[in-house]
Regions:
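Conserved N-terminal phosphate-binding loop of PLP-dependent enzymes in the Aspartate aminotransferase
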Residues: 1-263
Length: 263
């Protein structure tokens, strides 16, 4: 499934796309050839929010271990928005490597990765080169330290997730009362309205959702002070600065949209 122009044949030849939530597809690929690593979002968040099936990630962990393939969690989108331990902590599956960004920087540009000792030793021993002009940038490092120790503490993170649950429940009730072909998906402090009756399980499911209604909802919200990201593939995020009233304001605006939609 192409995502952008400009993807070279070399990248295509070195990459195998495996459908999310399909351990059978993963097993077929790893059984047929040698694969260095399997990179997966524990919860997909560039298609709204696509949750993993029950037991899927546990199966992925078992399959990759059996075939000697590294398991890498892409937590650029999830991170501490999922829980203080990230999506890795929330789902209870430990990968070999994890990539982080966005939320850990507190608004400053920051990316990080970490993993098992034997893998990180490849860098410290000079066997794998890891260079970057802004690696270890003091300003970004100070911000990350403050975020993780002073701002997004375990208690504060739990509070934002509880506040998101308040919003999710309110929006779900509106959808159910109006019998709309939509549903709400929640993970940690994030949520979204997906305009489809059934929960999506992969990228192809997401492409079949109603983007016209999603765009109409976005425009309606923008004109009433609800500033969601412009990409229809994004989510809302409850931050430590939001209050219960802020969360329920979104629900009120969504309710107004539904009233206009069904009038």
């Amino acid at each position: 499934v192409p995502s952008s122009a400009g993807i070279s044949s070399t990248v295509v030849n070195d990459t195998i796309v495996i459908p999310y939530n399909s351990p059978e597809a993963l097993e077929r690929v790893l059984k047929s050839r040698e694969v260095a690593c399997f990179i997966v979002e524990p919860v997909m968040e560039n298609i709204g929010i696509c949750l993993s099936d029950e037991g899927y990630l546990q199966q992925v962990r078992e399959i990759t271990q059996r075939y000697g393939t590294l398991l890498i969690f892409d937590e650029v989108k999830t991170g501490i928005t999922a829980s203080w331990g990230g999506a890795t902590g929330a789902v209870g599956v430990t990968p070999d490597l994890v990539a982080l960004a966005k939320s850990i920087g507190g608004g400053l540009p920051l990316g990080a990765f970490g993993g098992k000792q034997e893998l990180m030793d490849l860098i410290t021993e000079g066997k794998v080169v890891h260079l970057g002009t802004y690696n270890g940038n003091p300003l970004c490092m100070a911000a990350a330290k403050a975020v993780l120790s002073e701002v997004c503490t375990p208690a504060t993170t739990d509070l934002t997730i509880a506040r998101n649950t308040l919003l999710v429940n309110a929006v779900s009730e509106i959808i159910n009362d109006a019998s709309l072909p939509a549903h709400v998906v929640k993970f940690g402090a994030k949520g979204c309205v997906t305009w489809a009756e059934k929960q999506i399980r992969n990228y192809r499911d997401y492409k079949a959702t109603d983007f016209d209604l999603a765009f109409a909802q976005w425009i309606h919200g923008i004109n009433r002070g609800v500033l969601l990201p412009p990409g229809l593939d994004e989510q809302w995020l409850i931050s430590v600065m939001h209050t219960d009233a802020d969360a329920l304001h979104y629900a009120d605006v969504f309710d107004a949209f539904v009233q206009e939609l069904t009038a």
